[in-house]
Amino acid sequence: MPIDAESEAELRSEAEAPPGGFGKLMRVFTFATAVDRLIQIGCAFAAVCSGAAMPLMALILGRLTANFTDYGSSGDDKSTAEFMKSVQTNALWFVYLFIGKFTLVYLWSFGFTFTASRMLQAMRLTCLDRILDRTVAANDEETPGSLSNTVTSQCNSIQAALSDRLGIMIQAFSMLLASFAVAFSQSWQLTLVMLGLVIITLGLIGFIVSSDQKIEAGLLKRYAECSIIAEDALGSIRTVIAFGAAHKFLAKYNEILKKTETDGKKKGPFVGLMFACQYFFMFVGWAIGFYLGAYLFTKGMISDPGRILSVFFAMLIGLGAIMALGPNMPSFIKAIAAADVAFKILDDGTDQNQDSESQKDASQPEKIACQGHVELRDMSFAYRGREDRNALDKINLSFERGTSTAIVGPSGAGKSTLISLLERWYEPTAGSIFLDGNDIFQLDPKWLRSQIALVQQEPQLFNASIFDNIAYGLIGTEQENLSPEDKQTLVHDACRHARAYEFITKLPESFDTMVGDRASLISGGQKQRIAIARALVARRPILLMDEATSALDNENSKVIEALMTNSIDRTTIFISHKIRAATKADRVVVLDHGKVSEQGTHEELLSAGGLYKRLYDAQTEVESSDDEDPIKTITKTPIPTVVEKTEEASGGPQASIAEPSDNLPQIPKRNLLANLWEIAKEQRRYWPIFLIGLVACVVTAQIFPVQAILLGRVMQVFQGPPEKVSSDANFWSLMFFVVGLGAMISYAILGFFMTLLGVYLTRFYRLEYFRAVLQQPVEFFDRVASGTLLSRLSSDPSNLHELISINMGLLISIFVSVISASIIGLAYSWKFALVAIFAAMPAVFAAGYLRMKLDSSLAEEMEKISEESARFVSDSLSAFRTVKAFTMETAVHHMYNECLVSFAGRLYRQRAVMTLFFAFSESVELLASALGFWYGGKLMGDGELSTEKFFTVFIAVVVGGQAAGALFGFSSNLGKAKIAANNILGIRSQVRAAAARDQSRQMAEENHSEKTENTVVDMQNVTFAYPARPNVPVLKGISFKVYRGQTVGVVGTSGSGKSTLLALLERFYEAQSGTVNVLGRPISAHDIDEYRKRLAIVPQEPQLYNGTVRDNVILGLDEDKVQEADVATACEAAGLGEFISSLPDGFNTQCRGQGVSFSGGQKQRVAIARALIMHPELLLLDEPTSALDAESEQLVRETLGNIQEGRTMILVTHRLNIVRNAHVIIVMDGGRIVEQGTHTELMAKQGNYFKMHESSNGGEA
């Protein structure tokens, strides 16, 4: 299913469009409150002051250097005493700077984290509000996955940048500026030259970052496209699994990832260039600065060499500031691109896209009671992309209060579209709609919808309790603020009217039962009755029902008949394909091809002899079909007509309920190194790239130790005569330039190759992650919400990329640099180095290690928070129409706010502790410097250390300490990467373990060769409970056989276990006890992929995917194996021929927004065609005609008869007329088979089936 050309063009234009830039990121601060801004000002001041602490150290170093130089040339007892006193005094200043910096870093780190959380909480809420305030028409153009990705993942990127990383950036810039201020105070001439080079460097980096950000913005658009594909697949994962279509979604996903790889590789040169420029110009600055400093000294323009060295130390600290900027730049680049995406939603205030903005002056007659008189005048409407064909054409209708109106007509006649327009989801292309004489587009949309109760054809419930789902129907009404007791009374009354009370109270947790993600834990009929109760609970003046009985059995369908005949206090509009329900209405409106064909009472329309009579006669003919027109029986071998009875039905012992035999294992948690080793082992083809990058890492790691040696020699230069100072300065300046060239080349190689490696590995693991998710068993998706999975698919590969790209190269370089610096220190003076290293380094590493542990713990907590947030947002946006219909926007806002507040509280508590170690690791190098100067001075005073050796060791160890601090600066990245690697590699290991178990089971059952006997399905004493509710048995001792060529009907009340039977046959789940043999072998002995190719299913709620109609029909087949004639034949057999001919692009018509412009009947016929084209040996149909009109139902029924040759069918339905000619009918109740036989046999028994039949025929024979 390729992306259509229009979408690809839109994506390309968006990717090429210039991003919003740094200004968009700064706009995030508009979400700060006055308190937040006050805190941020204080934090910024603290960051500025903490940044100034290290440059102030340069002044102390300058004074100490002068002391060391003077002492080195004298060395008498008096100068020794003065020297030691000066060393001790200046060392104390280092301690004072440590205390100050530690306090300041703690304040700004926690403060920025606190305010960033609050700002992004407000931004997330505003973003969600903006999305929920959109019109349905505008929202149809985007998927919930891409929108929820903006609210969660993109906002996560912004929050990460504006938390402590913002403080680090401010501190780094302050350190850089303060370094130059200190340098200027010592020698303005020398500093001015070096400043020019820094400005050139920053200008180049700015240009590179701007170019890199454009690439990053394009990547974000591509990843949003990936989210759309993933949401498409995960939204109806059972259909994807049943048709073996995972590889198609993977192929689409991979196509996008190929483009991200191409774009991502463009980042390599920019990253390499950024680091190359940064370090090259730094060393060129050293070279020029040292040459010029020596010149000024020899000319007498600088008398004190300590001033020159103060400038050099200030520049060294400024270098550290630039180093601190580097690792944080990718986060800000990502945040800028993310802000651009977020503000496109926040700035989308066009009238046609926003409900509230489009009607700022809309009236809200709250004090006027709504009478419920609805009138449509010359109303026409066409869907986007099908403007040449009106879905509704010049409709004139009037609906009076206290009356019920049934709207009937063939599938695609425009019935559901009419409901959408009454809900103000779309705006008519012509004409008007009036409520009590007011144009509804001049009314406040929320007030309008608060007067309307809606039951959709495919009802959407939230992942909450049954009680909460029904109580949501009170939102926006006067009853919303009732006491909990009064609300409970209303909910229970509504459930009784909806015939839901009995099944709800039988559940173990009653009204507190969770319905699961996308209501996966309840049956279709139960879901529909809950939706009806939600519509009835507030007793709104207008009731709209769109195929509200499609999933209900005949007995429960009578609730609608009761509502139709009892409309005294409301206006009831009911859409149905069931003509029988329409007979109870006060008036019937017949739509055909978007026009009102006829209207009147049931009797009037029958007398008129028009379309209504034809529909009525067609349905009557279907219902009255008897054995004179049986479903064709092509099988040549005799077929038994009686299914074996279950032990329970025959009085045998009831099967015991077993615990689930194969729970999903927890994802194993391994340390980061173990995960990296596994990645390295399986990515051998990328070892050459890694090895080149590794060599570059080792080379770059030697830059700073070499710098320490050079600076140590430089300290000696100024102790000689002027003529020697000049010649030595020329030589060492050249050395700095040579080292700069080496740094430029090695960092360019490191940046390019490590970025390239990250791009390749990220694409691989993104695809592998998605593949592993799609290969999970169905029970996995019962436990993990699709919103959570979408969040993980987006965030985990990004977090892993943070480690396995340039950051990994920098980490290796830093680690090696620490070792090299320590070795040099030991080589020059082992005594001094041992104290400096082993007294200072353990403190640095201990603080850093604890920081990493806490950061990892915080990252795990943040992942949970992000997943819960993503699930909530995804649920809300997936049920967008329900949210709009029940005016739940404000309620969703408050629920999400409570969710975020709870998350923030957990974040603050953990962050308060972690920040202590962060502050210590940021400032501990000052303590190390104090110790180093004190002990080094002592050794010099004792004559055990020369000036050159002191400065070489000191600079090596200080730089090593700075490097160690930078190493732990990656702790947040490491913590997130560890979680991401565990998730990605862990879920793959689950797939492999499951595959191994399946293979072992198949090997154990190899002796079960496929039998050619007539038995296709043989279930014996099967017991089953869903893994999510292991103590609630759904099937109890089921035993039956289905023979080749048979059509077996399965009927029963809602929730009796009918659909569960099909789920077991599709191998979505495994029986807890008993045996299931299919196609002549134990079901577990089949290769699961090959097995599913021999089956096809038509689900109760058919799903269309983004792509063409043709793509949707051939979902279960490979593209190269499909003949166009087969597609046409399958569609014709499913009754789609005329509909497809009417589409502007025929089979190539795009199903945008998961087929939002298709009617329920049209979707169902596409699903039937999808099953028929598979030519399955066993065809499973779950309510295949629930959304079809009588003519289409008769057509499908004939189709099923025509295709029966060599095929076995199991048909689950509430419509008894569909199965009356089946070879065997199974009647289920409470998870058991209570009756079985042919229609005639069951009618003669006058048991459950007889009662259901009498009920469906209104007591008529």
From Swiss-Prot:
Residues of the ABC transporter domain? 374-618, 1017-1255
State the encoding gene. verA
Instruction: Provide the binding site for ATP.
Output: 409-416, 1052-1059
Record's function text: ABC-type transmembrane transporter; part of the gene cluster that mediates the biosynthesis of 11'-deoxyverticillin A, one of the dimeric epipolythiodioxopiperazines (ETPs) from the verticillin family that are toxic secondary metabolites. The verA multidrug transporter is probably involved in the secretion of 11'-deoxyverticillin A.
| The keyword Cell membrane is annotated on this UniProt entry | yes
List keywords of the entry alphabetically.
ATP-binding, Cell membrane, Glycoprotein, Membrane, Nucleotide-binding, Repeat, Transmembrane, Transmembrane helix, Transport
Q: What is this protein called?
A: ABC-type transmembrane transporter verA
Pfam families from the entry? Answer: ABC_membrane, ABC_tran
